[in-house]
Amino acid sequence: MKILARFRKAEPASIYDRIGGHEALEVVVENFYVRVLADEQLSGFFTGTNMNRLKGKQVEFFAAALGGPHPYTGAPMKQVHQGRGITMHHFGLVAGHLADALTAAGVPSETVSEILGAIAPLAPEIATGEAGKVTV
């Protein structure tokens, strides 16, 4: 039976592994929040926020969403974001900053598209408005 193991296809690497794992996500998230906080349309959402804690949770979330080894332990997206006035326009801006941070970190454009595709279904839990109105 050991011979059969040699002919099995290797499991495809997760996006998490392909982009460099936890350390790469820390770099991306740091750059991402520099961009988000510099955006006048978004910075107000973070007034009074413990950014170190938020960045840690964001890394944990992205790691879990992209096939990392550990589950996300934060509160549900809807619970965290409800009542904050986040619109689909804001969601699109954030997605654009994420794409830019990933690209700046050297993530290939095809992988950036995969990541945005993995995050897009969360739009209705984070923002108010129609999910189809997200533009990046």
From Swiss-Prot:
Entry cofactor note text?
A: Binds 1 heme group per subunit.
SUPFAM superfamilies xrefs: Globin-like
Q: Which co-factor is required?
A: heme
Residues where heme binds: H81
Q: Please name the GO terms that the record assigns under molecular function.
A: heme binding; metal ion binding; oxygen binding; oxygen carrier activity
Please name one Pfam family that this protein belongs to: Bac_globin
Q: Which PROSITE patterns match?
A: GLOBIN_FAM_2
What are the alphabetically sorted keywords of the record?
Heme, Iron, Metal-binding, Oxygen transport, Transport
Q: Which family does it belong to?
A: Belongs to the truncated hemoglobin family. Group I subfamily.
Purpose of the protein: Binds oxygen cooperatively with very high affinity because of a fast combination and a slow dissociation rate.
Q: How does it assemble?
A: Homodimer.
Official protein name in the record? Group 1 truncated hemoglobin GlbN
